[in-house]
């Protein structure tokens, strides 16, 4: 996994997952969810046909009258097209972690960088193909300064090499647990990645998982 894109700084500390994913729009409301980690695509619609990704960060994105708040970073150019989020410490704490990860993917995010994450949110990122990168708070600050000064210059997150790169900056190393790194590189969730390495029932397990979560797999069931 190597991703290059616009990075948007949104450094509010202790941002709860409920503020990312509104409680009123749950997975049960989705008409269809398609996740393709090969193409890195996640599409989801509500029954009314609207994109659920539009509901990410609703309390920040919209004013009380429903119009966009121009002060919110993702409502500004070029950050509307951001696929990398630079976040504050303890990002994604709370009880809506899985929904928060899905909303971030639906609004185009591929990578989130922060000094720390809510632990359950962090785990859920690997199940939905979102790369969570933990960086020192000072490093996050320096990266934010560079991005804010030249927002159109893209940032690259290279999972295979475990490095963040941006023109004019020294590459920034990061660490991902080897099993989680493998899960993202292979496009599987962590538990399944481990199990598929062992045991004679690996094929049966994969077939069962394919029937439960067909969107994870790039090819149709033989």
Feature roles, as predicted:
Residues 1-222:
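Cytosolic catalytic domains that perform sulfur/thiol-centered chemistry
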